[in-house]
Amino acid sequence: TTSPKKLLVLDLDNTLWGGIIGEVGWKKINIGGHHYLGEAFQDFQNKIKTLKNKGIQLAIISKNEEKVALEAFKKNREMILKLNDFATWRINWEDKAKNLSEILEELNLNEDSCVFFDDNMNERNRIKTSFPKVLVPELPNDPSYYTEELQKLNCFNTNQVTKEDLLRTKYYKDELKRKKQKKNFISHSDWLKSLKIKVNIEKINNENKMRVLQLINKTNQM
């Protein structure tokens, strides 16, 4: 059996919206706007947002100028997904396999917990070759079927969602901040003290038992 997927990695141009933002700008990408393709991309983003709200982590890997691409999230009101929905991103001209390797390391996830969604067949094949355990679905030519394709995967474990799952994007971002702050400390112990981490010990109860089971399963995986 395949492992439940925890991370959905997404391309941007012709995946989250129609058109190439570097050529048309954030105002003219095809998203919403009472156009059948724009509505299809919006539906797809809605489905992704639902997964995110159930604890699935989102990331972006896109060959674009970062500043230009991020304008869509900041300025285009038709966008369903916002920047704070994503745990991390790599928007550059680097090899996508290299970018995915960095993201998996950054989020401390194994490749078999990842789904890679990209409209470009060459990019999909590149990831398949480099990461055999990453799930890389074949995308239909018509974006209006993207939502259906994502639903068909049925690989995301969203049946039993804990409070920790819902806050995972925040946890990842907090962890990245801590790693950056670590560079300012010579002593590892001083860095740990600066974090002011508190540990609460609880008995197993109805509120935390689902999380306890998750941790047991993670320990067994190790």
Q: Positions of the model-derived regions?
A:
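Asp-based phosphoryl-transfer active-site loop
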Residues: 5-21, 127
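Short hydrophobic/aromatic-enriched beta-strand-loop microsegments
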Residues: 134-141
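Helix-loop element at the rim of GNAT/NAT acetyltransferase active sites that forms part
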Residues: 215-222
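Substrate-recognition element of Asp-dependent hydrolases with the DxDx(T/V) motif
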Residues: 43-74, 89-91, 199, 203, ...
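Active-site neighborhood of HAD-like aspartate-dependent phosphohydrolases
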Residues: 16-43
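Conserved Lys-Pro-Asp/Glu-containing loop-to-beta segment of HAD-superfamily phosphomonoesterases
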Residues: 100-121, 127
